[in-house]
Structure formats: C-alpha cells, structure tokens
C-alpha cells in the first residue's frame, strides 16, 4: 500500500475522555472514531489489526476441528425465556420489539441459539463430537462504557460451542480448546496467564480465563511463581489457619470511639493494628413471603469481602446489601458501629476463617460512638453459625497448593472457556439418541475470545511515550518505507520503490510513505501508529551506499548496504 492512496488521519491530542493508553493511542493513530458511548467505527488501520487477529483465531479454531458458521445478532426472546436468562441477565441485555411487538434481544452471547441449532440438527451419537464457532458482533448495554474498546457496548467476539455424548468427551473438547487458546495468544505475542475462574452468568461447573498482563487491567490475577497455581481474585482461595486460637487475655470492655465509623479510624484511635479489628457487613436475602433474612458477615479489618464467595454460601444466593432500615431494626444502631455481640434481633453470623481464629478482637458495640475491645468467641458471644472463606486473598498469602506464597498482578480478560455440562441442553431439551437408541442430553462447552478487546489489550502491553509498538503478527503493516526527499530525488524514489515491490513479492505487508512529508513528521507518525520496522531511504545514506533499519522497539537504527536491504529487512522481521 502507498500512503498517498490510503486514509491516514492521526491526531496530536487524545480526547479528554480517553483514560488509558490504548484508548488514547487508538484514537490518535486514527484506528477508531467514536460514534456514541461505547460504540466505535473501526477505521482502516484499526480494521486491519482486527482482521489479522481474526485470521489467527480462525486458523487455530479450524486446526482444532471447530466448524465455522454465523449466527444472527438479533435473537428471539422466546429462546432466552426458555433458558431462564431473559430475567436473569439484567440490564446489560438490550431488549427490543419489532413492528409486531414481538420481543427480541441484541445478542450479548449465543448459548441459546447454538443449543437451538443443536437440538434440531443433532439426532444421533454418530454425529458427535461437534464444535461450532462464529466471529460476530455483540452488544452489551454497559452502564458505564469506558476505556475505548476495553469496555464498549458493541464489540466483536469469537464464540465456539462444543457438543459431546458424555462428560468425558466434553472434557476432551474443553482441553482441546484450552490448548488452542494457548496457541492463539502465543501467536499474538502477548504475555498472558490462564487462570481458574468463576463461571458467572454463563454458568457451568468449570472455567478458565485468559488474562493479558497489564497494569491498567480491571481484573486481579492471583498466582504462585513457584508452581502452576493461578486463579482470578474471585476464585482464589484464602488458606485456612492451622494455628489454634489463642486464649483470651483481656476483659471485654465497651470503649468510646467518637466519630470512628471505619476500622482504620478505630485502630488509629485505640493505637492497635488494623488486623485486630473486625468489620461487620450486613446482607439481606429476600424471601418469597415475609421479611428478608438478615446475615452478618465478619471480616478482619484489613481484609475485603469477596462477593462471589459470599454468594455461594448456603442461604446467601441472590443476596443484597441490607438497607439502613433493616440494619437499625436488627442491630439497634446505624452502620459504623455494628458488631456480633448483643444484636437487637437474631441474625445469621458468618465469620471469615481468619476472624474465627481471632482472640481479644475489637468490634462494634451496636451503640453509636462505641466499640468493644477484648472480645472473644465462646466467652462474650457464641461461636459463629458458619465459618467460611469470605475474603479476597492478599499478596503473600500461602498458596492453596502448599508451594509458597501468592503474588497478585493486574490483567485484562481476553478469553474465557467454560465447561457447561447440561445447563443449556437440559433447559432447551437438546437431546440425541445414544448407542443404545435411548435419548440422552448433550454435554456442552463454550469458548469465547474478545477479538476487539485484544486490540486494546495488546496496546496496553506494548506502547511507550511515542505511541504503539505492535507485535508483528497483528501490526497493521509489518514494514513502513520512509523515503526522505521523495519529491526531489529520483534515486531515492527508485530505491524505495524497488524495495517496496521486492517486499510485497515476498508476502510482506508493507507501506510506502510516498507523501513527501518532512522526516520528523513522517517518523513521528509511524512511531505513533506502531509499525514494527521502519526502513529509511535518504539521499545522504544512498551516497554512503546504505539505508537505515529502525525496529520500533529498539533505540538505535542499523545501517545496511543497499544491496542487502531486502535480505536484512526480512532477517530483522524474523526477529520481531
């Protein structure tokens, strides 16, 4: 491609709303243009990157035995009602009506549609296993779209769905797709981790996220540098304490703590470590009849509640945070001074493992501006009704596999694989005849990759102060040739054109910048766009018999003889 015949429109400044590097740089490089909140036009450079990602994904899906199809963006509500997700999915599911007032959705995912296809197309075990995939536009009505393509409302994903006759076969399909995902992200040249994850609204019994490592990631990844253990923060298990609880050494005392409504303030006021305090979190579970059931969850003052773990406890499915009215009714006190001792009304008490092991702790006294000091289980209050892992792990916690301490880093989720089992096939009655001629329910897996999110994630991991630094595999162009003096020197033009044609003939995706721009402007623009390798052809260099090769990741350019320019460019590309 020649720049004079292409659309390049870079910007000096990013829009004020662009908070992270990928959003800023994609906008400045002319890759995307905002149409509405969370909705973008992919400009030519941006679309080229997307198509290259899709190409790698498609190759690996095909190699793994998956078969491509294309399912519609608009889906009938009846399928979502049949699966039960019409009500479960929430406000992110964009619901629309046609002219006949029939309900439809703009698909955020395609489990219902693919299961409907399976129940109509698969009749016999002889047709199994099967794995279908598509690369399609999705829509999720995010409350607060932000970060450009990272959390948009309209985006592109690859979804694959496997169908097997039994659980063992479904596990094999899961493992095949897991391995395919490993290959995809390796080919994309991204630093990533596969981590055990919660199944969320998709459901199923097992899942892994593929997380691109980036400081701006919204997810926290927990891993053990000394082993293969890795999980996201939602699933990472905080270890049980092995040491016995210490015997009480203090008497229970109600102490004044005026204005100290947070554990940090209480600890500072009393001159105690934050880890000696207990925070009280009040949840409510609505009942079919009568008032909501109220629960008191207790965590150490320096720990944070893991809502996913809490929601999996018996009786806490579908919980919400209690209202102030419910809190006052059950504790006789407003939030800030709540505790498990002498509540106004009975509540269910769940203690985190660390809290259940504490002695002489500080907790709210259910009286404004007062806390108890020297509180002890069994003496001052009953043992907790339930002891469970309620908290997020922290850096340095012992690894659940017993092989060292945990580390935590941030990541961007770009892929997710799920072992669904029969969640959707049972709901939609997707069955087949087994080898005994009897009906059996299909075993399923589903596997997603965020194609457009990968674009942003790759930039977050590969950029500097000057712009994007694309991995070669997904760069919009692999090489840019920058002739200095294009309009003045026939030798420069002829040399640049000859190299351009030679690279094209060898299948290199190359751009020739024939716009006759000033060198500084031209170089800065291509550094912003992030092409991995720049070849500079100038009259001064040609007089010395050389051209310059400048890898985007490297500080220094290399001079190579003109007659070796093609070979050296190809050799340099192979190293990128």
UniProtKB/Swiss-Prot annotation:
Main location: cytoplasm
A GO molecular-function annotation: ATP binding
Domain of life: Bacteria
EC number: 6.1.1.15
Gene3D superfamilies: Anticodon-binding domain (3.40.50.800), Bira Bifunctional Protein, Domain 2 (3.30.930.10), YbaK/aminoacyl-tRNA synthetase-associated domain (3.90.960.10)
Keywords, comma-separated and alphabetical: Aminoacyl-tRNA synthetase, ATP-binding, Cytoplasm, Ligase, Nucleotide-binding, Protein biosynthesis
Cysteines paired by S-S bonds: none
GO CC, any one term: cytosol
InterPro entries: aa-tRNA-synt_IIb (IPR002314), aa-tRNA-synth_II (IPR006195), aa-tRNA-synth_II/BPL/LPL (IPR045864), Anticodon-bd (IPR004154), Anticodon-bd_dom_sf (IPR036621), Pro-tRNA-ligase_IIa (IPR002316), Pro-tRNA-synth_IIa_bac-type (IPR004500), Pro-tRNA-Synthase_IIa_type1 (IPR023717)
Catalytic activity reported: tRNA(Pro) + L-proline + ATP = L-prolyl-tRNA(Pro) + AMP + diphosphate
Pfam families: HGTP_anticodon (PF03129), tRNA-synt_2b (PF00587), tRNA_edit (PF04073)
Domain writeup: Consists of three domains: the N-terminal catalytic domain, the editing domain and the C-terminal anticodon-binding domain.
Function noted in UniProt: Catalyzes the attachment of proline to tRNA(Pro) in a two-step reaction: proline is first activated by ATP to form Pro-AMP and then transferred to the acceptor end of tRNA(Pro). As ProRS can inadvertently accommodate and process non-cognate amino acids such as alanine and cysteine, to avoid such errors it has two additional distinct editing activities against alanine. One activity is designated as 'pretransfer' editing and involves the tRNA(Pro)-independent hydrolysis of activated Ala-AMP.
Record protein name field: Proline--tRNA ligase
Source organism of the structure: Bordetella parapertussis (strain 12822 / ATCC BAA-587 / NCTC 13253)
Organism classification: Bacteria, Pseudomonadati, Pseudomonadota, Betaproteobacteria, Burkholderiales
